Amino acid sequence: RQQAEALRERGFAVCIGTAGDMDFINSIARTRGMEQVLMDLIEDNPVYLEIMQARFEFFYEVQRRTLEAAGGLVDFAHAGDDFGNQRGPMISPAIFERHFAAKYGEYFEMVHSHGARTMMHMCGCVERFLSRLIELGLDVYDVVQPTTPSMDIAVLKERFGDRLTFCGSVCVQTTLAWGTPQDVEGEVRRRLGLFPQGGLFLGPTHAIQVGSPLENILALYHTAGSLAETIDEKILSLGTAAEQSDKINLAKLF
């Protein structure tokens, strides 16, 4: 609670959890292998189901206790699962319903009971799951990956924007990695232009990749800051990349 109070006093939103909380596909695949996990889901493998249940119970209880201790000061509870990849969904709606829907519904309900909003990380093409996740109680979708099929953020906003807040959308695969600062500025302006009344947490589509030009990263924050009412003054006061590169803690920027 003291940490939450300190963050609130500094004007920050308070978020608990990570993209690795729950995470029944990707994290379990790190030990069993992705092919095996996908087969497990099809075959209802009891070993996999036992691991999944253990993860669910662990992260559910960790977040429940954290929310309870914070006493209503948490804004968002974060979890994640990679239901999609670069080319399309990795599982069917039937598999989602059989293995994941009830667990996420129970988790979202618990989070809401403590006055927090739900936030879920999903890589890749996951458009087909958004309606159902909204029904189950999802509030914020992290992160919009625009280089995948069916994930145009303008279309997603049109379809789901009245029920869902989006996070991300500035591409780490193209614009930030290979573009110019002017390209980054243009993408930031286009993204924010789609959300004149809010509904987007602007940011990169994933972790900014090693080798991405520092000038592009700074362009993201400078442009967003010039269009926002408030932003961290430390970021806006940075000098040239050459002068400041050794002073920037990138982890704190994201």
Residue ranges of each PLM-predicted region?
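Active-site loop segments of alpha/beta catalytic cores
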Residues: R1-F254
